[in-house]
Amino acid sequence: MKIKNGIVIEDDFLSTFQELLNKDTSAKQCLELSTCFDELLSHVNIVRRTKRSLIEKYAKKNNDGEIQSDEKGAILFDDGEKKQKCLSEINEILNESIDIPLSETVKIYTDEIMTPRKVRLLKDVIEIVEREQPEKEKVKEK
């Protein structure tokens, strides 16, 4: 199963994914989710460090070698070409996908409460399904 780097490095992705660790599911899927979470933690750190090193490579620096930013916190560059090259390389990394060891999607019932943000972050690892009705209710419907 694949997830884009741009999703996994979003601030609340890991905490949202971690909520899946509290979901009742098969032992196999619990183990896979736990393994995925550990791998994602490591991967997020690598992607963030890589992004930071690209910024350090291209950004404008002061006399102390620190990255300069404007009053709004936006990083400054010596020229538009360096900024474009930096953004291009960062976007290339963010568009790459990580392959996570999850053999099947996590089932989320249609009546479970989630936010649109959580669904967007987890859309590659969840499947929204109808809750199965007990046999008695199925017979009544006929």
Regions found by a protein language model. Name each.
Residues 1-142:
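A composition-driven surface/loop motif
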